[in-house]
């Protein structure tokens, strides 16, 4: 199986919501980010992609590493993605640019929509919340905290 390497940024609002984007010609929402250019490391790619996709200028030292995760690619059937993910407070003004067709704020503690990229739904959100997807499903189903 082919592997695609990407960088992404969790932009979190003061209320805990995180920004998701949908790229033109796709149906899945994901984090802002993308593939590094030749010679570019994960951090530099994350900064560049946020500037290109959202018009926001982040500095490398302002990003905090969440982790590196591997799962099925959202828009490339038969591929896996390895994503290095960073976090940053959401800037006040973000607007779709470049290939971004739509922005959507997401409450990661609530029920997750079905149109999220696997990297975001299966790996990143559980990592930032500190619990597994299975544990979240149990909580949502029972309406109570896990034991």
Which positions does each model-derived feature cover?
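Short loop/turn segments immediately following the C-termini of beta-strands
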Residues: 23
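Actinobacteria-biased recognition of intrinsically disordered, low-complexity terminal regions
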Residues: 1, 133-147
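Active-site-adjacent beta-strand/loop module that shapes the phosphate/pyrophosphate-binding cleft
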Residues: 69-95, 127
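Conserved hydrophobic "DFG−1" position in protein kinase catalytic cores
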Residues: 11-12, 20, 88, 105
